[in-house]
Amino acid sequence: MPTIIPLLQKVRSGLPFRIGPRPSGPDYQITPRYRVAFLTGCIQDELFRGVNADTVSVLARNGCEVIIPEHQKCCGALHAHVGERELSRQLARSNIAAFEATGADYYIVNASGCGATLKDYAHLLHDDPKYSQRAAQFVAKLRDFAEFLVEVGFEAPAGRIEARVTYQDACHMKHGQKVFLQPRVLLKSIPGLELVEMKDSDWCCGSAGIYNVVQPVMANEVLSWKVENVSNTKASILVASNPGCTIQINFGMEKAGQPLEILHLAEILERSYRLAEEAPA
């Protein structure tokens, strides 16, 4: 990992960061149906705090008391990508303990790369006599943000968003977590939104964890196919649920001279909720 950090620092400029205050509770009253613990992530927390804030808000709007575990750690995905398996196992143990302490009904994650890693904890710790069963119980409570909302039932947003929108199926979301219908259910619930499927929406964008950092030439070749497919949809908004995809596709679209707005699913849902609230009576 130390060799990766300088490379990551080189790609910071020009990225669609949405840095703000860390999420806290909503500024409106809710009647909770569920108590959920939320993993804020590393890249998501440092570079896309607005995404996390909107995630908390949408969850609260849908009857959740949201807890952010104080002692949560990195999920361990990047460590696993570079072969630091034992460190990844240590992080898994720490997260399991931190989330268990909340007493939450569900554990929620909004970044597909983190989610795929968290859902692998039972396999990662299968031979750990102290944590194998706890890891299995952790995974049983874990849900992706979209997966959770569709499973428990959500309040459809009422604010109109007149836009042509396409959705990026992150590799770790569709192939790793098998979550692909739920984001579309949520998007189709937004009034005025036209969802246009891109060709090969589940093809890798070239981010692939840290692949675009350690193998930028090959990653950019993969990215060129994604840029073409996004462009062909004529969408003005792309929705993605992984920070790596957001960063990579934003880079490709800007380089191609075809910038477009890239939003997380939580952001576009929260936008619709707020538009309805702000509409004149």
Predicted features and spans:
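Iron-sulfur cluster-binding electron-transfer modules in prokaryotic oxidoreductases
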Residues: 1-281
